């Protein structure tokens, strides 16, 4: 049952912080829904030529600065939510840290995600990289490394993939 007396004893600043936390949470869910919608829309609009496997561990290693910033900002968001709720206890911090480690290790152990070679470029994780963006192409072991000014995309070398990439990169 809702207790009016307990609700009235909460300081005004705490109420404002709770409202801000609720708005941020709803906003983040809406943003994720928007990204999912945008990705499905892009995938329908482009002509997909071939599906390729993207190697996540190598890609994460080469893009470490961007990924570490994302993880740190999400952890700060969670700790901020705990602080706002007034329940910042070491058990919460450990639980969240363990959850992040498990998720991160699962992604790394899984090791591969899908990307799509399209006529317009390379579609990876909802981002369409134009063929003109790629500045350098390296072949190391069983991987093809495409370098943009910001990212490195590591594609597993498969039969026919190398020739398709060479054809499209020569055009641009």
From Swiss-Prot:
Ranges annotated as spanning the membrane: 16-36, 68-88, 89-109
Protein topology in the membrane: Multi-pass membrane protein
Compartments where located: Cell membrane
Source species, domain of life: Archaea
Gene Ontology CC: one annotated term: plasma membrane
Keywords of this entry: Cell membrane, Membrane, Transmembrane, Transmembrane helix
Protein's name according to its UniProt entry: Uncharacterized protein MJ0210.1
Organism: Methanocaldococcus jannaschii (strain ATCC 43067 / DSM 2661 / JAL-1 / JCM 10045 / NBRC 100440) (Methanococcus jannaschii)
